A protein has these predicted regions:
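Extracellular/periplasmic solute-recognition and catalytic clefts
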Residues: 1-10, 144, 148
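Active-site lining segments that contact anionic ligands and/or coordinate catalytic metals
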Residues: 2, 89-94, 207-209
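Short, well-ordered beta-strand elements within core beta-sheets of diverse protein domains
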Residues: 5, 124, 180-184
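Ligand/substrate-recognition segments at binding pockets and active sites
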Residues: 79-151, 188
């Protein structure tokens, strides 16, 4: 799957969204989250592909860092007012919604907030119960929310879901024709190429979804269990080998 931060385009102007994409230190967030379990990975470049899948390309912008983020804001007319940037009397201040009581989520969110402060963007952390995620998402009451999605065997379908304006409350209409072209293309490899182009442009031009981590997949099993465990895309419904050879060590 993929863990991400989602920026609400109804509440956060495009230049600020672009600055957040450029300024977030995803590698440090990963380190905070996974260091205790000894997991290391390269920051993901996609919401739709795992790095091991056919067609994967790193779609994340290459010009990143605090200085890049500040320049994006200043080029858009934002000026520092104390610790934070502002424009037309409105401070770059937004609510970062987290869900549940996971300590790692709290720690990484605080780091994210602290890092944005260095850039000049204020993030106020709002914690809600896991049960409120759907309500908050439907009402679009968040500025930024932490979320996560499963990655499927078909990145094309995922790209069509994430990167159409219909799902993003009308934002990114200029890319709808590219999404439609992708779905109308018969050759699957060409579809994958268009999907990566669509994702790259959406990250650069619309800036809503920030892929942060893929993470590990652990399963707890009784000692002695053989031929069973994390299995990526394989499911017993479609692949009998998932369960037919499961058993106990002799």
């Amino acid at each position: 799957g993929v863990g991400d931060y989602e920026l609400n385009p109804d509440k956060i102007p495009l230049p600020v969204r672009k600055a957040i994409v450029a300024g977030i230190n995803r590698e440090q967030i990963q380190k905070i989250r996974f260091e205790k379990i000894g997991w290391n990975e390269k920051a993901p470049g996609s919401m739709c592909f795992l790095p091991l899948q056919e067609g994967y390309k790193d779609s994340y912008p290459t010009e990143i860092g605090e200085d890049v983020a500040k320049k994006i804001l200043e080029d858009a007319g934002y000026k520092k007012d104390g610790d934070f940037y502002a424009k037309d009397g409105k401070k770059a201040s937004y609510e970062l919604f987290t869900f549940g009581d996971d300590q790692d989520v709290k720690t990484t969110s605080q780091f994210f907030s602290d890092q944005m402060k260095k850039i000049g963007i204020e993030l106020k952390i709002v914690n809600r119960a896991n049960s409120e995620l759907t309500k908050v998402s439907t009402e679009r009451s968040y500025g930024i929310k932490s979320a996560g999605y499963g990655i499927t065997t078909n990145p094309v379908d995922s790209a069509y879901y994430f990167y159409r304006s219909e799902i993003n409350n009308g934002h990114g209409k200029e890319l709808d024709s590219l999404a439609d072209k992708m779905m109308a293309t018969e050759d699957y490899k060409k579809q994958l190429e268009i999907a990566t182009e669509l994702e790259k442009r959406h990250l650069a031009e619309v800036a809503i979804y920030i892929p942060v981590s893929n993470g590990p997949n652990y399963q707890a099993c009784k000692k002695g269990l053989a031929n069973y465990g994390p299995r990526l895309f394989a499911t017993s419904a479609y692949d009998p080998d998932v369960w037919i050879n499961a058993g106990w060590e002799k």
